[in-house]
Amino acid sequence: MASQGTKRSYEQMETDGERQNATEIRASVGRMIGGIGRFYIQMCTELKLSDYEGRLIQNSITIERMVLSAFDERRNKYLEEHPSAGKDPKKTGGPIYRRIDGKWMRELILYDKEEIRRIWRQANNGEDATAGLTHMMIWHSNLNDATYQRTRALVRTGMDPRMCSLMQGSTLPRRSGAAGAAVKGVGTMVMELIRMIKRGINDRNFWRGENGRRTRIAYERMCNILKGKFQTAAQRAMMDQVRESRNPGNAEIEDLIFLARSALILRGSVAHKSCLPACVYGPAVASGYDFEREGYSLVGIDPFRLLQNSQVYSLIRPNENPAHKSQLVWMACHSAAFEDLRVSSFIRGTRVVPRGKLSTRGVQIASNENMETMDSSTLELRSRYWAIRTRSGGNTNQQRASAGQISVQPTFSVQRNLPFERATIMAAFTGNTEGRTSDMRTEIIRMMESARPEDVSFQGRGVFELSDEKATSPIVPSFDMSNEGSYFFGDNAEEYDN
């Protein structure tokens, strides 16, 4: 992308940094990770968790959610102004699982938000450390991306459920800042914009008055974020049209859906980061590892190396397969929900199977589930190779894909040709090329028609041995192109419900 020079790196967004050099970035990301680790250790002490209980991913998620809720200012304010029955706006909590007499027991805990904020700040040199909070949000978002399909949400906004590869980050909260915006897929941004336009159509005051002015600024900002994800001039020009519209309505919704479809072939730039659960960072800090001094990167070898040496456990329901549970969490850790399964399999060193073939439900346990039959097992989160995470969609001058998911959004910068089902995608582009965006639409369709799946994306990038930390000798993997590449293929994943 031409504008690369003006952009802050994702690590800088992650740590609210101004321009920094690589060493400073590694140090500030390390500081953020260390803060999460220290906080987690302190929480385990407060809750008197054993080492095993502290490494249980379900306990980690509860603790992460508590601190995110404690700092959710908007919701806290709302809860105080609209008191609801049985909800104390000043408290936060969730299920903590303990091993008692050879059985797993659920205990619902409740803490003052003020107390949680104090522990968090104390672990982060007295600062609010928003970057660390965002990091945990992205981990939860990546876990949701690997666990659920967003079919219903896509259909509700008039999009096609087969566009699910564009939906990365669709469950990220609004307050996730620049780092959050960077990891959102094209479909996620389109969906947010469509929801906004629909509100404007239904509520005449939406764009009016002082509030309307703020709404308008938010709308234009979201348009610019989406525009920045596109890599071709015609797609960006269309985004300018959508942004400058006096009174956004159905024409803009049409344009946005058109752009989302076009992104299946002319892929957008979406960042990928390996965000790990707090129960990985905690024990590393406890063992004496100094993240700030050693430096850390979310897009290099560091997360792979950390997972090679980590022990994480998970509760397992009676008919779940622990290996499948491990795959789900591995994909979440590396933000690989929409990556080509062949690439993921090669890097992981064990076959990564489509979502529909997994015998596992989500990681979190509902409050009405029976604990009597719960078991626990070790999650296998190690990998055979590592690869650099990408922030682009691959070369856009782009074999078969499937009925479920008809494209991929690459996570790893690995040389391969990107599969897409041209006939399926192009079928969606019949008809409407008139109107004020006609020339751009025609241009985009022309580019898509001339795109060739055989063209290799990420020229010369490969995977690396775990001993090759400077990424000096790339291994370019060969893929069996007859295998199915998409994760949500012909799928029955559960829907994501708030």
UniProtKB/Swiss-Prot annotation:
Q: Which protein is depicted?
A: Nucleoprotein
Q: Which InterPro entries match?
A: Flu_NP
Q: Where is this motif: Bipartite nuclear localization signal?
A: 198-216
Q: Which HAMAP family match?
A: INFV_NCAP
Mind telling me how this protein is modified after translation? Late in virus-infected cells, may be cleaved from a 56-kDa protein to a 53-kDa protein by a cellular caspase. This cleavage might be a marker for the onset of apoptosis in infected cells or have a specific function in virus host interaction.
Biased-composition ranges, Basic and acidic residues, are: 8-21
Give the location of motif Unconventional nuclear localization signal in residue numbers. 1-18
> What organism is the protein native to?
Influenza A virus (strain A/Brevig Mission/1/1918 H1N1) (Influenza A virus (strain A/South Carolina/1/1918 H1N1))
**What family is this?**
Belongs to the influenza viruses nucleoprotein family.
MF terms in GO: RNA binding; structural molecule activity
Q: How does it assemble?
A: Homomultimerizes to form the nucleocapsid. May bind host exportin-1/XPO1. Binds to viral genomic RNA. Protein-RNA contacts are mediated by a combination of electrostatic interactions between positively charged residues and the phosphate backbone and planar interactions between aromatic side chains and bases.
- What is one term from the GO cellular component aspect held by the record? viral nucleocapsid
UniProt keyword annotations, A-Z: Capsid protein, Helical capsid protein, Host nucleus, Host-virus interaction, Ribonucleoprotein, RNA-binding, Viral nucleoprotein, Viral penetration into host nucleus, Virion, Virus entry into host cell
- Classify the main location: virion
Residue segments, region Disordered: 1-21
Family matches, as Pfam families: Flu_NP
Q: Which GO terms describe its biological process?
A: symbiont entry into host cell; viral penetration into host nucleus
* Location in or out of the cell: Virion; Host nucleus
Under the heading SUPFAM superfamilies, the entry gives: flu NP-like
Miscellaneous comment in the UniProt entry for this protein: South Carolina isolate has been sequenced from formalid fixed-lung tissues of a 21-year-old male which died in 1918 at Ft. Jackson, SC. Brevig Mission isolate has been sequenced from lung tissues of an Inuit woman buried in the permafrost in a gravesite near Brevig Mission, Alaska. This sample was recovered by John Hultin, retired pathologist.
Q: What does this protein do?
A: Encapsidates the negative strand viral RNA, protecting it from nucleases. The encapsidated genomic RNA is termed the ribonucleoprotein (RNP) and serves as template for transcription and replication. The RNP needs to be localized in the host nucleus to start an infectious cycle, but is too large to diffuse through the nuclear pore complex. NP comprises at least 2 nuclear localization signals that are responsible for the active RNP import into the nucleus through cellular importin alpha/beta pathway.
